């Protein structure tokens, strides 16, 4: 997602929808960002303990309980936002970027997004192998490149730099499916039946005008 990162070292970055903070740790340690790990469902105290166990202090990474639709930060606070595997839950609203997210990004700042997606729109005729693991309602959160291009292009405040299929599709799925958490276990039926040929991961890069 950020292999060609345009965010300078030392930037203040929001990891939006950070979960338990794995991405937050990576971008703080590897890229030297000051990271705000913002998530509605995780416990900031537990995340802080995890960050400290990884040798990262609050000077480098700060856990924040935050709703993506009502972020508790000053306007133009962040140099960049990175959002991995969560934007598809709240960002399908065409108004979201301009009204809920970009106000907190500095002019010229970047937004990097990675979402699970589909190679093509098949929602009107869902492959049976996908239905082994997910309901039609759950699959609505997986959309194709043209869908996301249309969504982000509706923003009046963002320059669309890139919307493309990520190269790491098979590697990411392989790493995920060996996990023993209930979600990974549930996904195995579809993927073992060949469902992966319909799926991808989509990279979105935006720059605030």
Label for each model-derived stretch:
Residues 1-9:
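Conserved alpha-helix/loop element of class I SAM-dependent methyltransferases that forms part
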Residues 95-110:
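A short glycine-rich, Lys/Arg-flanked "PGG" loop and its adjoining helix->strand segment in the class I
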Residues 69-81:
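A short acidic, Gly/Pro-enriched loop at the edge of an enzyme's catalytic core
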Residues 14, 20-70:
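Class I SAM-dependent methyltransferase SAM/SAH-binding core
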Residues 116-138:
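Short, glycine-/aromatic-enriched active-site segment of Class I SAM-dependent methyltransferases
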Residues 80-93:
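A short SAM/SAH-binding and catalytic strip from SAM-dependent methyltransferases
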Residues 162-209:
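Conserved Class I S-adenosyl-L-methionine
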């Amino acid at each position: 997602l950020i292999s060609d990162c345009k965010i300078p070292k030392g930037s203040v970055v929001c990891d939006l929808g950070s979960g338990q903070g794995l991405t937050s740790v990576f971008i703080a340690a590897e890229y030297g960002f000051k990271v705000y790990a913002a998530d509605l469902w995780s416990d900031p105290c537990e995340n802080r303990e995890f960050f400290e166990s990884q040798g990262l202090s609050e000077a480098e990474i700060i856990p924040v309980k935050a709703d993506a639709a009502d972020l508790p930060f000053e306007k133009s606070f962040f140099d960049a936002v990175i959002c991995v595997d969560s934007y598809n839950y709240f960002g399908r609203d065409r108004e979201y970027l301009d009204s809920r997210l970009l106000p907190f990004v500095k002019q010229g700042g970047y937004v990097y997004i990675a979402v699970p997606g589909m190679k093509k729109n098949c929602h009107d005729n869902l492959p049976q192998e996908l239905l082994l693991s997910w309901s039609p309602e759950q699959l609505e959160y997986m959309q194709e490149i043209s869908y996301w291009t249309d969504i982000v292009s509706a923003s009046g405040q963002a320059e669309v730099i890139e919307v493309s299929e990520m190269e790491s599709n098979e590697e990411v799925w392989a790493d995920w499916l060996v996990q023993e958490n209930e979600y990974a276990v549930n996904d195995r039926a579809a993927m073992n039946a060949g469902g992966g040929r319909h799926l991808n991961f989509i990279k979105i890069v935006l720059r605030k005008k």
